[in-house]
């Protein structure tokens, strides 16, 4: 880890410690039984014609504020109406302007899978994700030791959450195991935040043939999605391309027309 990612993880440890002081993990565990069964993001992507995972985020470390006043109750239903296969909701507050409340708000408004996108480092965050209504969580190889990543994946499954493992390089291929439901290739280096969509193509041939593959970050051209499909990808996580426009749902709708 280095640069921006190191700063994010250091802050995340501090943040989770504070949250544990406010609400214990035992209190979270008590609320798990009241949560409805999860929707399968893996199945949604495998059976989808579009594979678009539309992302709700207000800002990023590299771009600053994208849509500061964005409200999930307005944007999330528009994503669904446009044809999103699944939703990604950023819940990191300091660096991405999100919160768990965004998932809680969005959950009753849509019937597609929602993934909690955050920097998961502790099982406490898995309980949080389950309670607010997430169906899946992101585990980032660059942010976790391999043993810890597998441990969190197993704990996620125990809670009925699916796991999207995010890798960026061939060095992280050993993180892939039977506990991983989907494999995401991040086209953005989390140390420098430099983006290169060709990263997905470079790694695609080294991944299990039966894996549900997701390309993440830097996708703004419908032609790239067509190329990614040919390379074996079933999911395409896109946020800024939609969120930076006045009507994200309408932008998604036009994007989908262009990739059909």
From Swiss-Prot:
GO terms for biological process: L-tryptophan biosynthetic process; L-tryptophan metabolic process. The keyword Amino-acid biosynthesis applies. InterPro entries: Aldolase_TIM (IPR013785), Indole-3-glycerol_P_synth (IPR045186), Indole-3-glycerol_P_synth_dom (IPR013798), Indole-3-GlycerolPSynthase_CS (IPR001468), RibuloseP-bd_barrel (IPR011060). The keyword Amino-acid biosynthesis applies. It comes from the Bacteria. It is an enzyme of class 4 (lyase). GO terms for molecular function: indole-3-glycerol-phosphate synthase activity; L-tryptophan decarboxylase activity; phosphoribosylanthranilate isomerase activity. Pathway: Amino-acid biosynthesis; L-tryptophan biosynthesis; L-tryptophan from chorismate: step 4/5. SUPFAM superfamilies: Ribulose-phoshate binding barrel (SSF51366). Keywords: Amino-acid biosynthesis, Aromatic amino acid biosynthesis, Decarboxylase, Lyase, Tryptophan biosynthesis. Its EC number is 4.1.1.48. It catalyses: 1-(2-carboxyphenylamino)-1-deoxy-D-ribulose 5-phosphate + H(+) = (1S,2R)-1-C-(indol-3-yl)glycerol 3-phosphate + CO2 + H2O. Belongs to the TrpC family. NCBIfam families: PRK00278.2-4. This is Indole-3-glycerol phosphate synthase. The gene is trpC.
């Amino acid at each position: 880890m280095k640069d921006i990612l190191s700063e994010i993880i250091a802050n995340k440890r501090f943040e989770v410690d504070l949250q544990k002081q406010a609400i214990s993990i035992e209190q979270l565990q008590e609320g798990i039984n009241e949560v409805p069964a999860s929707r399968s993001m893996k199945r949604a992507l495998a059976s989808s014609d579009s594979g678009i995972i539309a992302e709700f985020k207000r800002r990023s470390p590299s771009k600053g504020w994208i849509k500061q006043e964005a409200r999930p109750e307005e944007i999330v239903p528009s994503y669904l109406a446009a044809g999103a296969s699944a939703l990604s909701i950023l819940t990191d507050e300091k660096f991405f302007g999100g919160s768990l409340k965004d998932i809680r708000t969005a959950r009753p408004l849509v019937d597609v899978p929602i993934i909690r996108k955050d920097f998961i480092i502790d099982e406490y965050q898995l309980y949080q994700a389950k309670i607010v209504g997430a169906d899946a969580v992101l585990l980032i190889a660059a942010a976790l030791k391999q043993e810890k990543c597998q441990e969190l994946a197993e704990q996620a499954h125990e809670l009925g959450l699916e796991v999207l493992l995010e890798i960026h390089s061939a060095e992280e291929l050993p993180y892939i195991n039977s506990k991983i439901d989907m494999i995401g290739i991040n086209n953005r280096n989390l140390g420098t935040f430099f983006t290169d969509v060709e990263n997905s193509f470079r790694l695609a041939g080294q991944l299990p043939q039966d894996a549900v593959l997701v390309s993440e970050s830097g996708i703004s051209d419908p032609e790239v999605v067509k190329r990614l499909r040919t390379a074996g990808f079933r999911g395409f996580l896109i946020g800024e391309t939609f969120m930076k426009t006045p009507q994200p749902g309408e932008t998604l709708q036009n994007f989908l027309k262009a990739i059909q």
